[in-house]
Curated annotation (Swiss-Prot):
Subunit (UniProt): Part of the small subunit (SSU) processome, composed of more than 70 proteins and the RNA chaperone small nucleolar RNA (snoRNA) U3.
Family according to the record: Belongs to the WD repeat WDR3/UTP12 family.
GO terms for cellular component: nuclear membrane; nucleolus; nucleoplasm; small-subunit processome
Lineage of origin: Eukaryota, Metazoa, Chordata, Craniata, Vertebrata
Modified positions (Phosphoserine) in chain numbering: S249, S725
Composition bias type Acidic residues, residue spans: 247-260
Localization of this protein: Nucleus, Nucleolus
Record-given protein name: WD repeat-containing protein 3
Per UniProt, location of the Glycyl lysine isopeptide (Lys-Gly) (interchain with G-Cter in SUMO2) cross-link in this chain: K473
């Protein structure tokens, strides 16, 4: 066997430079008993918990690979539900930061998550148009609600009734009866997508936000209240003065007429509209926990805040209005003998008042509201430019003014990072964007310097790591001092964008290339500072090489004899540095070369192009050694690992790949970024790689000591592709359901397939062991003595348990959320054995609840085959008897426990009442004593 080249694996080390991703929503979370101080923010595949007071990241909820799209804290504040791009939902504990519960049911990104009032159920809406209700306590799905024709945008539980209301991009608002999982009402009064909805006024009013500047209000009348004869007729609210009889309002009246027969549980009628100041669509619509503050925003940077008055406040307002109207009427009819009859009508504007506007520093992506203990309204915003802002507002004042109380900025750039560099000691990392330069400590990932700059395109640390040079989009060179964090000098270098710079190997100067078709050579020099007597670093231009095309990239050879220049005409030209004479032309790319690098020994040059290819050339003759199809989109950056012929490429396909330039092999792919990668940097030691992407994140990759074998890597890649294909296969057909309609809550994943395989293996083992035991009994009978039975090593590893107990342990080991899907994949040939074993287990009273759940599901999906199988008839008869008796026993035990808990509750309440009265009497006695003491003091003074 020949020697194989050994590579070392690079792994993801950390994500930094990111405050919050744009796809998800920001929410307040309760930590350490404090409300309003901590917020959870989506950060690519993770969730960051930020302390708003200190501006620090205090907890990271680790995700897998998919991007976070939705967050929802539980009512008790102990858990956080997180929805992902692939449709998965994970529930994290905010105490430990671990995600123990995973729900897989949606086929597309999760768009909405909402807990019910007690936190026992979770409703999730998705881009796959389905709504799924999950049982959080049992860690399983309850049912899937199908009806929307486009992505679901919002789902809300009603507090007092077992109902759910959902909105979607299909312009529909649907009401669901959760007792029978049926959509009993569809509201079709919207002409555009419904982006949000809230319930206010004790759930008797629904407010919806669509793709226009209106917030529509709908009155909800519940059946029980309509049927109650003692209930007075609700007041008819007039529509806003600005709303005419539009075709939409006609539609809503037609809808009301047509749906009278459908009003089994409730009826909806349009109450009017509130006009927003923004003209674009509603992005987010929310109400605070008190139900008094309503807020919404569009695609701009303004949050509009409204106050919803209570019945008493509205009545008070109406009384004032009526009094004013009567006074006016009396003045107008002073000559008439009879008092005129006056009446006032209540409009929607009397009930919902505009309070204030909160203007943020950038476009709002999401927000959340909370009331502080002092009564102030706090609004936290996740902005488009990687920023979190907190505003406070006292809504009780006549003209409240929002005040910005906190801001998290230092942890990231406001725009995409376009250039990265490592210091010579591998410790500092420079990142530069459109408005600022940041210096990061690689070990702590903390930002240690922030300096304002122009739109940066390229950068490097000056030898000595005390200064940095930036090349900008306007063609300037900017020189910064790191110790003071100041701009030393700005030099006009090029007439167009300065696309690339390369430090000379002798470290005395550098070369720049720009869009003005020029390559310029610069030397470092010391000049006297005007503001002080000390000398400072500066640069001076020495030579210029004029070319026929825009320069995109420049690179020195390590011996400083050659200079490679990439041009807009898709070629790379190589020149002698000393004479600037032409040496080689490297042509073959179909689109311009965006990046290139020369190996440490000067033997190879690798070029990456917008045509998605990487070409490896020899620098001696300019021959192309190999052309590699590297990425699925443009190759944006290319760097050799120091002192090797290995190089990294970064592409717009969100991937970083490592290649061997000698063997022309793909070594590994570093996946993590969710959008285009703009740049990367390799540390001088080669141990670290840092990359920047359009998803605003900076990622650090670290070289481990783990050897990477290419054959194993290819095998792992094939396994991953197979697992992906298994998950994409169609669901097994269930009798009674049409093809393509899946009303079960789960979906087929590789985990459910593996769970089904574990059940099959356990049943096979049970069959084998049962046969062995029969043989063993026959041998013992023939021998007339007890012969030792060989023990199965698997059973011995589980504590020398019986084969049937091993089957039960296998069922108990399957996740609750994956149980139904695993049973759905299980072939029918194993079902008779499973039913027989279930009968044994239930008779002994083992895990009755779990086994009944499995049993009823198997009976449901294999009903036809089970009933037609004569051999299973006695088993089913026995199961019928045992399940009824054992379930009753469990029911009785639960009833007894509930009665016991009720008794304890009453005892505690009685004790607390006694304590309350005891405290009250002691307070009264203390007050009497104080009064007596005061009287004595007064008497002594007199």
């Amino acid at each position: 066997m020949g020697l194989t080249k050994q590579y070392l694996r690079y792994v993801a080390s950390a994500v930094f430079g990111l405050i919050g991703s744009q796809k998800g929503n920001i929410v307040f979370v309760t930590l350490r008993g404090e409300k309003g101080r901590y917020v959870a923010v989506p950060a690519c595949e993770h969730v960051f918990i930020w302390d708003l007071r200190k501006g620090e990241k205090i907890l990271i909820l680790q995700g897998n690979k998919q991007e976070v799209t939705c967050l929802c804290p539980s009512p008790d504040g102990l858990h956080l539900a997180v929805g992902y791009e692939d449709g998965a939902i994970r529930i994290f504990s905010l105490l430990s930061g671990e995600g123990n519960i995973t729900f897989n049911g949606h086929k597309a990104a999760v768009t909405s998550l909402k807990y019910d009032q007690l936190g026992g159920r979770l409703a999730s809406g998705s881009k796959d148009t389905d709504v799924i209700i999950w049982d959080v306590i049992n860690e399983s799905g309850l049912y899937r609600l199908k009806g929307h024709k486009d992505a679901v945008t919002q789902a809300l539980f009603l507090r007092e009734r077992n109902l759910l209301v959902t909105s979607g991009k299909d312009t529909m608002v649907k009401w669901w009866d959760l007792d029978n999982q049926h959509c009993f009402k569809t509201m079709v009064g919207h002409r555009t997508e419904v982006w949000g909805l809230v319930l206010v006024s004790e759930e008797k009013r629904l407010i919806t936000g669509a793709a226009d500047s209106e917030l529509r209000a709908w009155d909800i009348d519940y059946l029980q209240e309509i049927d109650d004869p003692e209930e007075p007729e609700p007041k008819k609210i007039k529509e806003c003065p600005g709303i005419q009889d539009t075709p939409e309002s006609e539609d809503s009246t037609l809808e009301a007429d047509d749906e009278k027969s459908e009003d089994r549980i409730l009826s909806c009628s349009k109450a009017g509209s509130i006009m927003r100041e923004g003209r674009d669509r509603v992005v987010n619509l929310a109400v605070d926990k008190t139900g008094r503050i309503l807020a919404c925003h569009g695609t701009d940077s303004v949050l509009e805040v409204f106050c919803i008055l209570s019945k008493a406040e509205v009545q008070k307002k109406m009384d004032k209005k009526l009094k004013k109207a009567r006074k006016k009427a009396r003045l107008n009819s002073a000559n008439e003998e009879e008092d005129p009859e006056t009446s006032v009508s209540m409009t929607l504007q009397d009930e919902i008042l505009r309070v204030a506007k909160i203007k943020t520093s950038a476009k709002i992506k999401s927000f959340d509201l909370i009331h502080s203990p002092q009564g102030e309204l706090k609004a936290v915003f996740l902005l488009q430019n990687n920023l979190v802002e907190l505003y406070s507002l006292n809504a009780s004042l006549p003209a409240p003014q929002p005040v910005r109380t906190s801001r998290i900025t230092i942890g990231g750039h406001r725009s995409d990072v376009r250039t990265l560099s490592f210091s010579s000691d591998n410790i500092a990392v420079l990142s530069a964007a459109a408005d600022s330069i940041k210096i990061w400590n690689r070990s702590t990932l903390q930002c240690i310097r922030t300096m304002p700059c122009e739109y940066a395109l390229c950068s490097f640390f000056v030898p000595g790591d005390r200064q940095v040079v930036i090349g900008t989009k306007t063609g300037n060179l900017q020189l910064y001092d790191l110790a003071s964090g100041t701009l030393l000098e700005t030099i006009a270098a090029h007439d167009g964008a300065l696309w690339s710079m390369s430090l000379s190997p002798d470290q005395r100067g550098f070369v720049t290339g720009g869009a003005d078709k020029a390559v310029k050579f610069w030397d470092f020099e010391l000049v006297t500072d005007k503001n002080s007597t000390q000398k400072r670093l500066s640069v001076k231009q020495t030579r210029t090489l004029q070319l026929d095309e825009d320069v995109l990239c420049v690179s020195y050879s390590p011996n400083q004899k050659l200079l490679a220049v990439s041009l807009l005409d898709c070629t790379v030209k190589v020149f002698y540095v000393d004479t600037l004479k032409f040496f080689l032309s490297l042509y073959g790319h179909k689109l311009p070369v965006l990046c290139m690098d020369i190996s440490h020994d000067g033997a190879l040059i690798a070029t990456g192009s917008a045509d998605r290819n990487v070409k490896i050339w020899g620098l001696d003759f300019g021959d192309c050694h190999r052309s590699l199809f590297a990425h699925d989109d443009s190759v944006m950056y290319l760097r050799f690992v120091p002192k090797s012929h290995l190089f990294f490429t970064a592409g717009k396909d969100h991937k970083i790949k490592q290649w061997d330039a000698d063997k022309f092999e793909h070594i590994q792919t570093l996946e993590g970024h969710h959008q285009e990668i703009w740049c990367l940097a390799v540390s001088p030691s080669g141990d670290y790689v840092v990359s920047a992407s359009h998803d605003k994140s900076l990622r650090l990759w670290e070289r481990t000591r783990e050897p990477l074998i290419l054959e194993e890597e290819r095998e792992m890649q094939r396994e991953a592709e197979y697992e992906e294909s298994v998950a994409k296969e169609d669901q097994p057909a269930v009798p009674g359901e049409t093809q393509g309609d899946n009303y079960f809550t789960g979906k087929k994943t590789i985990e459910t397939v593996k769970a089904a395989e574990r059940i099959m293996e356990a049943i096979e083992l049970h069959r084998e062991e049962t046969a062995k035991m029969k043989e063993h009994r026959a041998i013992c009978k023939a021998a007339g003595k007890e012969v030792p039975l060989p023990v199965n090593p698997i059973l011995m590893a589980h504590g020398n348990i019986s084969p049937s107990a091993y089957v039960l342990e296998t069922f108990k080991g399957i996740r609750s959320s994956e149980l139904e899907e695993a049973l759905l994949v299980l072939p029918f040939s194993y079902v008779p054995d499973v039913l027989t074993l279930f009968n044994e287990f239930i008779q002994t009273g083992l895990d009755v609840e779990l086994l009944c759940r499995c049993l009823f599901f198997l009976l449901r999906i294999h009903f036809g085959q089970i009933t037609s199988n004569q051999m299973l008839v006695p088993v089913i008869e026995k199961l019928k008897e045992t399940t009824i008796s054992k379930v009753r026993q469990v029911q009785d035990a639960i009833g007894f426990n509930m009665a016991g808990l009720d008794y304890l509750k009453r005892e505690c309440e009685a004790k607390s009442e006694v304590m309350f009265f005891a405290e009250a009497t002691s307070h009264l006695e203390e007050k009497k004593k104080k009064r007596k003491n005061r009287k004595r003091m007064i008497l002594t003074l007199t």
